[in-house]
Amino acid sequence: MSIRSRWLMISVGLGILLNPLNSSMISVAIPRLQNVFHLDFTVVSWIIFSFYIASAIAQPIMGKASDLFGRRRIFLSGLVVSFVASLLAPLSPNFGWLIVFRIVQSVGTSMMVAVGMAIVRIHITEKQATALSMLSIFLSGAAAIGPFIGGVIIHLWGWPAIFLVNIPFVVTSFLVAWKHIPKDDPSTTSVSRNMSFRKWFELIDASGVLLFTVGLVALLVGLLSAKSSGQISFNNVIVGLIGFVGLGAFVRHELKAKAPFIPLRTFAKYPAMTWINVEFMIVNLLFYSLFFGLPSYLQIVRHVSEFHTGMLMLSLGLCSLIASPIAGSWIDKSGPWPALLMSGMLMTLGSVWIVTLDQTSPVISVCLALAAFGISNGLNSVAMQAALFRSSPKEIIGVASGIFNTSRYLGTILSSLLISIVMGDNFSFEGFRILGMILTLIALSLVFMNWRHKETGQLHES
């Protein structure tokens, strides 16, 4: 690999790690944000919802935009947007403005994730597989150590530091990318100059994006408002109904759209692939329920500092990183289903362990649940990808990958919703135990699904 290629890979890697890093660092900051802005957990959870909803929408749109405006231009623009958001978020006068800057940050980091892999595929031809695997390490590594980094810097410098820490990464990535990422081909980007707004809106399925956003946000607002107030009011019902109607209209629109935001017709055509995405959504629901729930439990219920919370969460990240390469060798020999079955069992074990904890249990014992979920996450990250490729025809693998990412975001959004509904305004030991019981039931259903996959052969190629 040439020196220029190495610098290109470094610039892309530093850019794309910002999305998983910022999505994971925030898990340790939630109790601090509750205290600073004097809000309950249900309201503060929008710091999670907003980021993932924005990412779910921005990444596919920016992927399409890069074909028209150029990948280098989108990547550099994403760095500028991320820089502005990271600089302004600590200056937020209230929580509403913090949510706005969090959404802007999500859009900026999503721009880089959407085009980063494509830049490497196009411009690095020598040892391309090695380069792509290195980028995967940037992504998974950032997500794994995010809570640890977040815990340390919040403990030392307060919550604004989790935004300011992005600036050195952004500046370095921008300077290196400006010099080493080749300029976009003018013939590729010239199409955008002659494209009307109407044609552009059709290309990105603006109507579908709007219906999806309005429906999902309205449904979440209706549910969480009812939970927060402790009663179901007329306004809650109206907002919830708007959400249901919006999502229903979204489904109807997507089935007819020429270039749908989420190609729902693909689900009916390829049922094996559909089940993989359903399972992936459940996997992320389980994993992120622990990932976002446990730091708040440790800090609010057990009074553990941010620093020590980050240290404990590191056991989850390290186990995940160690398990991934082992899973790769195992799956090459035995296929994905044994690894997925083992992952479901580990998630069940970790969930049961949460239920057995009491208020006198040593805090270090939480590491057992974290280790179980960490190993299962390492197995899932490889096995689910392998299962997707086996269940998806080669001619739609690009579409399948897009749906796969959407399933991850939906699972994460559902995890935050589950935590908010179970915990309500404040975290409690009883609520965390109930959460563990619910996760145990969901994990058992995952084990059953994987056992069925083994029996019916749904993980074999379509």
Q: For each of these PLM feature ranges, what is it?
A:
Residues 1-4, 186-200, 453-462:
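Intrinsic disorder in cytosolic terminal tails and internal cytosolic loops
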Residues 5-21, 26-30, 37, 41, ...:
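12-transmembrane solute porter fold
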Residues 38, 70, 91-97, 125, ...:
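Helix-breaking motifs and short loop linkers at transmembrane-helix boundaries and internal kinks
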Residues 57-93:
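Conserved MFS/SLC helix-loop-helix module at the cytosolic interface between two early adjacent transmembrane helices
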Residues 105-137:
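Cytoplasmic helix-loop-helix junction between adjacent transmembrane helices
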Residues 142-154, 158, 219, 415-423:
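Small-residue (Gly/Pro/Ala) motifs that create kinks and tight helix-helix packing interfaces
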Residues 157-279:
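Hydrophobic transmembrane-helix bundles of small-molecule transporters
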